[in-house]
């Protein structure tokens, strides 16, 4: 750890109108066992309440950047990267938290990486209204687009590289910034474009280092945007995804969105998209039809039932058996 402990890591946290959540996120970043940390909170638009809450934190490692108008999460992250003083940048969403050794463990791996531009991620504890789950169930593999976008089972959490787990060099983020104005799929978009750059590779810490607070009832861009927006994004990303990944994304992401919105006129066109533009596997058809035929509440119950013991089993695997 000595070779990495002096290297400054800048933590970029975009936020808007969530003072109680962002102060919790900041506290988890400032509580890292890795000492060489600065925290850059980008307040995305006029927000006096959040500014006031952040100003109560007296730690000199906290930097507050105020934006005069709302620009969205992708652009706010880019502002944070440009203001960062560290050689490395880690991202943290304002409603998530880090475990204390997150940066320490990732930086230990980062300095040993053979890649010029390593992108580090980790397992994550997904905290949902239905319980806690340890994701991902599979660790990253090539091609990355299939790992992220295609599924091989009924349950969620197979391929996950959540934004709050990401750490990489600031230089890479300046060369490949987040796509300004992109409302959805920001992390997938950045990851897929970044790994296309020579010298870039994925490094993964297999233990959970962050908590992803998943609130299914909270309205977000991801839950309110029309499915057509996601279709346009995947079409524009064809150079970065395999045909298998394309089919998987349309089947699960677009199928779920269109079904939730009751857009039955999209059923046949999306099915044609899966078949004609991709290379689907049987699981893609099963998932697609399931999205339309099973109500959202039923699908969530099935996922919860299938995964309910996962976190306990994983914790036992990491800590060893309990002695009677």
Specify the residue positions occupied by each region the protein language model found.
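Glycine-rich, basic loop-to-helix element that forms the pyrophosphate-binding segment
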Residues: 67-84
